[in-house]
Every structure is written in structure tokens, then in C-alpha cells.
Design a protein with these regions (language model features):
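A conserved alpha-helical element in kinase catalytic cores
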Residues: 22-23, 35-77, 84-109, 209
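Conserved NTP-binding catalytic cores of kinases and kinase-like/nucleotidyltransferase enzymes
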Residues: 1-65, 176, 264-271
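A cross-family kinase active-site recognition segment
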Residues: 82, 88-142, 184-188, 271
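Regulatory N- and C-terminal appendages and interdomain linkers associated
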Residues: 1-13, 139-142, 150, 208-212, ...
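Active-site Asp-x-Gly
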Residues: 173-218, 222-228, 252, 258-261, ...
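An alpha-helical support segment within catalytic cores of ATP-dependent transferases
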Residues: 2-6, 114-163, 173, 222
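Active-site acidic catalytic loop and adjacent metal/ATP-binding pocket
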Residues: 25-30, 39, 68, 146-191
């Protein structure tokens, strides 16, 4: 792919494509001081969600997360967070080692910030697709929608969340392990750990293991200051939400895989 014309004020050269997909393209570049950084060009499909992600990045200001250097139109200029993913740790050192690192990153992300966090997605908006499938299909979707409503009514102190933390969104570089690609959500801290139960998406053997879900929840709970059972409950709801999103995209195969994850986590909630 021919390198695109990034905003000239950034004075970036030597663009190298890192990834391209439905969300847009990501490039590594060299700035005027010879340092590497990353630029992301959002696709039209991803652009509507950009304000929440940018708001969250500005709120963290590099604490536990990639630092936003600038943004212009559909372009984002970001710190180079490194090349090693948490998935590589899982593959080489195992799930327990990867989960310990994820817990450390979560702890850093949930540390207080003096900056305001505005314009984040609400949990009500985030779970709209789940409520729609609950009305259309019932079953697990209805159960998850009911549990989601119950969790959101518990009066838990909400805070800004990454919203999409998983093994390929945690990178290691000069500043250690950092989170990238946030969604920017305002909600129960336990929800920020829930997506790790759903990942890696390629490892259905791990995702559908109830005992693994319980181990992860116990390890991640101290990082977000919530009980392991709350993480498991949100994990079930999130897996059903993911299935609903896949159905919106008419991807029934991935929806079925997501529901397998939901059913596995659901078993940990049964008395």
C-alpha cells in the first residue's frame, strides 16, 4: 500500500504499514528527531467512535496507556508502544504469566487521574445491541440483558474504562506494558476486566474453560477493586453482547462461538 499523506505539521517520514482492517490503517513513522511513533487513519466505519477513544486517551495522559500526541480529522498520532504483544507472552510463558501482566496494566489504568473524563460512552449505549437481541430472540440474550440491568443498578462507583482490553491491545516497549486502542466507556470497573475472559479470540479452548474464567477473575479482581464474581457476571454479559454485535454484522459463525464463551462463563455463576 502506498503511504498516505499524513498531516504535514507532524513532519513524519518513512511510513511503514503495520495493520489494515475495517477500523482503518496503522503506520509506524519517524519524526523530525528520528524517533518512531505510530499514526492511525480511521475508516468511515470507525470514525463515529473516535471521540470517546480520544477522550479516554487524554484522560489517561500516558498513565498505563499509549500517549496521544495529536489528532487531526480522521488521523491520530500516537506514541510507539512497542512491538511485543501480551499474546506472545501467553504463547511462550502461558496464560498465568499473561494474566499477571494484564492485572498490572489494569491496575495502572485504574489509578486516579487529575484530568476530567468527558464524552465517554455510557454502558446503556454500549449494550443497546444486546437489548435488541433480547427482544428478538430471548434465551441467553434475555438472561444477559436482565443481568446487565441488575449490575448497572447496584450503585457501584463508576469510572472511565478502556472498554476493549485484550491480549493484542497490550504492548511492551520502552515504557513497559501499555494499553492501546481504547473504546472509552464509563461504567463498572469490573467490566474492564471482563473482556480478558473473552480472549484471545483464537483460543476457543481457553475461552470456553469455566475454571480458566474463574482463575482470571480472581487474579484481576484486586486490580479493579471489585469481586471476582462481578467480573464473571460482566464476562457473561459481554460475551452475549459480542454475539449480538456479530449478529448485527451477519456473522453467525462468530456469534455462535461467542455464545459458547457465554455459556462457559455462565456455569461459574450457577449456584
Amino acid at each position: 500500500m502506498t503511504p498516505p499523506a499524513v498531516p504535514s505539521v507532524w513532519k513524519l517520514t518513512k511510513l511503514t504499514l503495520l495493520a489494515e482492517g475495517i477500523g482503518g490503517s496503522v503506520w509506524r513513522a519517524v519524526d523530525s528527531d528520528g524517533r518512531t511513533s505510530v499514526v492511525k487513519r480511521l475508516s468511515p466505519q470507525a470514525a463515529p467512535d473516535a471521540p470517546q477513544a480520544l477522550a479516554w486517551l487524554r484522560w489517561r495522559d500516558g498513565a498505563g496507556a499509549i500517549r496521544l500526541l495529536d489528532a487531526e480529522g480522521d488521523w491520530q498520532w500516537l506514541e510507539d508502544a512497542g512491538r511485543r504483544t501480551l499474546t506472545s507472552v501467553l504463547d511462550v510463558e502461558g496464560d498465568a504469566a499473561a494474566t499477571r501482566i494484564a492485572a498490572d496494566v489494569l491496575g495502572a489504568l485504574h489509578a486516579p487521574s487529575d484530568r476530567p473524563a468527558e464524552g465517554l460512552q455510557t454502558m446503556e449505549d454500549r449494550f443497546a445491541a444486546l437489548r435488541l437481541e433480547a427482544d428478538n430472540q430471548g434465551g441467553l440474550f434475555s438472561e444477559a440483558a436482565g443481568l446487565t440491568a441488575s449490575l448497572m443498578s447496584e450503585g457501584v462507583s463508576i469510572r472511565p474504562l478502556h472498554g476493549d482490553l485484550h491480549h493484542d491491545n497490550i504492548l511492551h516497549g520502552p515504557r513497559g506494558w501499555l494499553a492501546i486502542d481504547p473504546h472509552g466507556v464509563l461504567g463498572d470497573p469490573a467490566y474492564d476486566a471482563a473482556n480478558l475472559l473473552y480472549n484471545p479470540v483464537e483460543r476457543q479452548d481457553l475461552r470456553t474453560d469455566p475454571e480458566r474464567a474463574q482463575r482470571l477473575a480472581r487474579t484481576l479482581a484486586p486490580a479493579v477493586g471489585r469481586p471476582a464474581q462481578a467480573i464473571l457476571a460482566w464476562g457473561f454479559c459481554h460475551a452475549c453482547l459480542s454475539a449480538a454485535w456479530h449478529l448485527e454484522d451477519e456473522n453467525r459463525e462468530e456469534a455462535a462461538r461467542s455464545l459458547e464463551v457465554a455459556q462457559a462463563i455462565r456455569r461459574t455463576l450457577e449456584v
